[in-house]
């Protein structure tokens, strides 16, 4: 084959393949509905782990008298994450914008990255499926990333690193009036369950507002 013919053939082949190459090199945009589905799955998994571990621990170690005393005492039942401003009822929650609810959810998730590792022994002795400090920490980090992605998509698309929760649990723990390790772990599990319930609720509201046909799930 002549050199000129070979060059023409290669050029024609390249032109035919160009649209496919361009399409393959482009990064497809993940649908917003899928991003919310992924975030909700992670949030629900975290809440279920928190709820099941809390129930298991309470039934195994906490007497009814201890439970009532714990819940009625504002010093023992105070959660360190309550320093994060969150809406206190349904009406106030509905008044928050989507981005506000996502930011609150992000701060709640970030607030648990340190203290959840203090529950290592509790998770290690738990019979709840998937309950280990490494699994829970990974779920928290995955959801943190998922919420940051949702904030990026719902805002203006500009890159953002997300606000980092600054108050450390260790500072709160030094002020704790609970010297009993058993009750201290119970208090952490109580707060963890409470906060993961908030996160799942806030994400569900934002999903309902943002994705058609997603309400009621």
Curated annotation (Swiss-Prot):
Residues 1-26 form the signal peptide. Its main location: secreted. The lineage of its organism: Eukaryota, Metazoa, Chordata, Craniata, Vertebrata. Glycans are attached at residue 166. It comes from Pan troglodytes (Chimpanzee). Pfam families: Hormone_1. Plays an important role in growth control. Its major role in stimulating body growth is to stimulate the liver and other tissues to secrete IGF1. It stimulates both the differentiation and proliferation of myoblasts. It also stimulates amino acid uptake and protein synthesis in muscle and other tissues. Keywords: Disulfide bond, Glycoprotein, Hormone, Phosphoprotein, Secreted, Signal. GO terms for biological process: animal organ development; growth hormone receptor signaling pathway; positive regulation of receptor signaling pathway via JAK-STAT; response to nutrient levels. GO terms for molecular function: growth factor activity; growth hormone receptor binding; hormone activity. The gene is GH2. This is Growth hormone variant.
């Amino acid at each position: 084959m002549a050199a000129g013919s070979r060059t023409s053939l290669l050029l024609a082949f390249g032109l035919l393949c160009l649209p496919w190459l361009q399409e393959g090199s482009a990064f497809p945009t993940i649908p917003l509905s899928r991003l919310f589905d992924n975030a909700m799955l992670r949030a629900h998994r975290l809440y279920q782990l928190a709820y099941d571990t809390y129930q298991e621990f309470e039934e195994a170690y906490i007497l009814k008298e201890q439970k009532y005393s714990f819940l009625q005492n504002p010093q023992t039942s105070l959660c360190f994450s309550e320093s994060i401003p969150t809406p206190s009822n349904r009406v106030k929650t509905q008044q928050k914008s989507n981005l506000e609810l996502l930011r609150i959810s992000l701060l709640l998730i970030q607030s648990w990255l340190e203290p959840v590792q203090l529950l290592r022994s509790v998770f290690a002795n738990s019979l709840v499926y998937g309950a280990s400090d490494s699994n829970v920490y990974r779920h928290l980090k995955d959801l943190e990333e998922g919420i940051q992605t949702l904030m990026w998509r719902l805002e203006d698309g500009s890159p953002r690193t997300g606000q980092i929760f600054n108050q450390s649990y260790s500072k709160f723990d030094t002020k704790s009036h609970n010297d009993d390790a058993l009750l201290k772990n119970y208090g952490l599990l109580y707060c963890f369950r409470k906060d993961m319930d908030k996160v799942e609720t806030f994400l569900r509201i934002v999903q309902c507002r943002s994705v058609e046909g997603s309400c009621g799930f």
